[in-house]
From Swiss-Prot:
This is LOB domain-containing protein 41. Residues 3-109 form the LOB domain. The lineage of its organism: Eukaryota, Viridiplantae, Streptophyta, Embryophyta, Tracheophyta. Residues 169-178, 190-200 have a biased composition (Basic and acidic residues). Disulfide bonds: none annotated. InterPro entries: LOB, LOBD. GO terms for biological process: cellular response to hypoxia; regulation of DNA-templated transcription. It comes from the Eukaryota. It comes from Arabidopsis thaliana. Belongs to the LOB domain-containing protein family. Residues 162-204 are annotated as: Disordered. Pfam families: LOB.
Length: 263
């Protein structure tokens, strides 16, 4: 019967033939150091997180992944700001090695002071540090963002204006068609009224016959005049609608006839 590895034993999990932790501990000689390193990483990354990180790589790379995770965790505890990369860059990699050895022995890791961690411990390229982003970049990003917002607002305003113009043009066309229909109807009414007025004027302009004058030769003379002269006040004016045209003729003798045309 095969015994479980030191990593699975401290994690209290079953160890099988294809265990992913067993090959990761092959470079550590002492069983106690293997157990201490596994417990330290399980506390730093979490048990499930540690297993996921190890299983993310192939079998031949898992020992290197375990060692890299151990050095990164120790470097982050020693220098919380720059981690193991800052210790390597500043020439203090020995501090990270000492922290790894302390973990394997089960001893606590010593953290450097905050002032020492911030002065000369990180790489000179400040673009990789989120605390040293230049204000120009921020202003440029803000400017680009503001221009994008302005463009979006102008496009939206243009769309709204085009829609409003279309609606206004449609309303004007409807009003124009309505006005045209009303004007057409008013023209018809005006034409009808004009015809009635013309008919009334035609009736008023009826020829008026004056009493015929008989000459001595026996001929009848008719005096025809248009009703354009001012009407005398002595005569009674009859309304146009009540006017009737009538012809009366009387003959006293064979040579004398009297014809009257009355309205």
């Amino acid at each position: 019967m095969r015994m479980s590895c030191n990593g699975c034993r401290v994690l209290r999990k079953g160890c099988s033939e294809d265990c992913s932790i067993r090959p990761c501990l092959a470079w550590i000689k002492s069983p106690e150091a293997q157990a201490n390193a596994t417990v330290f990483l399980a506390k730093f990354y979490g048990r499930a997180g540690l297993m996921n990180l190890i299983n993310a790589g192939p079998n031949h790379l898992r020992p290197g992944i375990f060692r890299s995770l151990l050095h990164e965790a120790c470097g982050r505890i020693v220098n919380p700001i720059y981690g193991s990369v800052g210790l390597l860059w500043s020439g203090n990699w020995q501090l990270c090695q000492d922290a790894v050895e302390a973990v394997m022995k089960g001893e606590p890791v010593k953290e450097i002071a905050t002032d020492a961690a911030t002065i000369g411990q990180g790489p000179p390229l400040k673009i990789y540090d989120i605390r040293h982003i230049s204000k120009d970049d921020n202003s440029a990003a803000a400017a680009t963002g503001s221009t994008d917002l302005k463009l979006a607002k102008t496009r939206r305003a243009k769309r709204v204006s085009t829609v409003a113009i279309q609606a206004e043009s449609e309303g004007k066309s409807d009003e124009a068609s309505h006005d045209s229909s009303l004007s057409h109807q008013s023209e018809i009414v005006a034409a009808h009224e004009g015809e009635s007025k013309e008919s009334e004027s035609n009736v008023s302009e009826v020829l008026a016959f004056s009493p015929p004058a008989v000459k001595g030769s026996g001929e009848i003379k008719l005096d025809l005049t248009l009703r354009l002269e001012p009407v005398s006040r002595a005569y009674h004016v009859v309304p146009v609608k009540k006017r009737r045209i009538g012809v009366f003729g009387t003959c006293q003798k064979e040579s004398t006839c009297k014809t009257e045309l009355m309205l």
